[in-house]
Amino acid sequence: MTAEEDSNSTGRFPEADSRDVPEPAARQEAEPAAGPDPEARPQDDARAEADRTRSSVGRRALLGWGGAGLALGAVAAGGTATALHNDEADADPASAGQAVPFHGTHQAGISTAVPDRLHFAAFDVTTEDRDELIQLLKDWTTAAARMTAGHAVGDGAFGPVPESPPDDTGEASGLKPSRLTLTVGFGPSLFDKDRFGLAEQRPEALVELPAFPGDKLEKARSGGDLCVQACADDPQVAVHAIRNLARIAFGKAAIRWSQLGFGKTSSTTPDAQTPRNMFGFKDGTRNVSGSDEKALDEHVWVAEKDGPAWLAGGSYLVARRIRMHIETWDRTSLKEQEEIFGRDKREGAPVGKAKEHDEPFLKAMLPTSHVRLAHPDAHNGARILRRGYSFTDGTDGLGRLDAGLFFLAYQRDVRRGFIPIQRSLARHDALNEYIQHVGSALFAVPPGVRGKDDWWGRELFS
């Protein structure tokens, strides 16, 4: 699967375009205003010493820092949330206009505007204790709410107790929120073997993705119990977020694989210029719009009637690492490239049309063209919301670029979305000669966090 002209393209790789105007998060509720923050990038006045010491001790205990942390286990039990929370209600709003609201009906990072950079991480849960997993999700939620607002985790990177590790790693200190969004999902393996008493809560649509023709999946780049998608305009802000969530997870979960991305390959903002993928073609021309509530309800959000109840308002995320054979593509004639995609390379217009957004005449295209095969008309109207990014990870042993598309797509049901679309593309798409799927994962993405007492996955564990 590769790049598609439509909402359904399961394999494309556009370049970044920072001209997107930040749109209001679709159906996201505004974050309550906050007061002074202990470290809202940059650092503010310190708090009372007793408060700081209690928070620092709780943080050390959470991360398992040596004998002192273990000896103070009783304090840690009540101190962890304090260290991470840091009175969010008392924090100043950071960089107005660059922070995306964290709380809302749906998680940010799905229908909200797409920032320029990505750091995606899949985690294996290493603890066998259900309560520890719940506490991890609570701590992640608290930290995520702070970071997306432009604040540091806990007491920040510069104190208050020099003899203990700081709560925040510090590389984002002084930086703006950069439209950071953090989106969490649960993989099929989290429900396997009833590890945490969740087997009966596994959604029917959270299936193992089938093997598709041409797949060459690497186990080290596939699967995961949990995932976190961090998107931001500043790559350092996105990396900082994943780094700190991984740090909080120490002893409970560990990163299984991760991927950095640049040059968003699709936009959810209708008036934004369509980005180009690494094959040089405009990508995501007909992507689902983040402001089209009817389309989102029909194709992206899980409805109450779909079940299970804990997932209503959430979605399903497919992640695919698609390597592009750049050198082979670059030796292909322009005429053949355009026939493969079914679009003009300069304007992005469908074959036989003049403008990018003209309705394509599918019969004018080759039966194996990417646009024709991925079009909703070929799949009973099925659409997916694509949010992928390009990647480059150096070169292989033969000096060929390890580059391509990190494909991300949200949908209401993968059995009616990604799976039939990709099955058709994998069998017939002429673009398959130039791409290889090497990584794959599927996650159920819970609904948004609706208030300070809510947390990622609360209804799943209730």
Kindly give the residue locations of the regions a language model identified:
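Long, histidine/aromatic-enriched segments associated with O2/redox biology
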Residues: A3-E4, S56, A61-T82, N86-S462
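N-terminal secretory signal peptides
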Residues: M1-V57
